[in-house]
């Protein structure tokens, strides 16, 4: 919506009708035409694609556009540079549609080809327990996402019951030798409260990564000796 406003383009934004009011206000402020859609994010995507297929607009979804992953991979390039051309021992990545995880795979593969890495860093894929088609499939050794409902969760940004790139995400996580975790609602909210005490006000979806870190740290105290990166992708005002 912001880029379209700057370019003088009409922007149609499709959102779940349950989206937080704070997110809605940001979109409205840019003058976008808002289409609230009943159901989960899959229903939203279907409605947007239908409009695009009718030739009325271009569907600028970050999920389907392959160039988007060329952008998310640079996040990991920056981390490599900031750590002196090395990578942390462990990443906790929140995953719904998988844009960050797929970008990580591109970055790691290219860094290995260039001689900066000898192997993939360890990756933990994090999902909300209320909506975890990928984590469930991974734990069960399945190649396709497990059936899931569009259940309500405070981590609305990763509540994707049928991720379009689900098979690719599972293949990618296994190729990297990663693992998967789920966190429940109270674990997410508790993690968010702790982050706030550190001066980091994040949206609830972002807190899911820290919740997984806290959970795994309780099981494996030695994790405190590792270099760990937790992406905090969204500001707190987005979910309040």
Over which residues does each language-model region extend?
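Glycine-rich ThDP/TPP pyrophosphate-binding loop and its adjacent helix/strand module
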Residues: 79, 83-106
């Amino acid at each position: 919506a912001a880029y379209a406003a700057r370019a003088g383009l009409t922007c149609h934004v499709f959102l779940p009708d349950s989206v937080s009011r704070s997110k809605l206000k940001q979109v409205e402020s840019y003058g976008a035409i808002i289409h609230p859609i009943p159901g989960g994010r899959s229903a939203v995507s279907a409605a947007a694609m239908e409009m695009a297929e009718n030739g009325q607009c271009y569907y600028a979804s970050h999920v389907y556009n392959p160039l988007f992953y060329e952008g998310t991979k640079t996040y990991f390039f920056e981390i490599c540079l900031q750590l002196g051309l090395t990578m942390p021992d462990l990443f906790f990545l929140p995953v719904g549609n998988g844009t960050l995880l797929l970008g990580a795979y591109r970055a790691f593969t290219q860094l290995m080809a260039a001689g900066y890495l000898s192997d993939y860093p360890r990756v933990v894929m994090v999902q909300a327990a209320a909506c975890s088609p990928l984590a469930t499939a991974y734990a069960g050794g399945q190649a396709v996402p497990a059936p899931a409902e569009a259940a309500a969760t405070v981590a609305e940004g990763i509540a994707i019951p049928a991720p379009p790139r689900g098979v690719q995400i599972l293949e990618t996580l296994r190729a990297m030798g990663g693992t998967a975790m789920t966190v429940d609602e109270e674990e997410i909210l508790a993690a968010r409260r702790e982050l706030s005490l550190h001066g980091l006000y994040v949206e609830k979806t972002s807190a899911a990564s820290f919740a997984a870190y806290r959970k795994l740290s309780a099981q494996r105290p030695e994790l405190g000796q590792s270099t760990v990166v937790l992406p905090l992708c969204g500001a707190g005002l987005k979910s309040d």
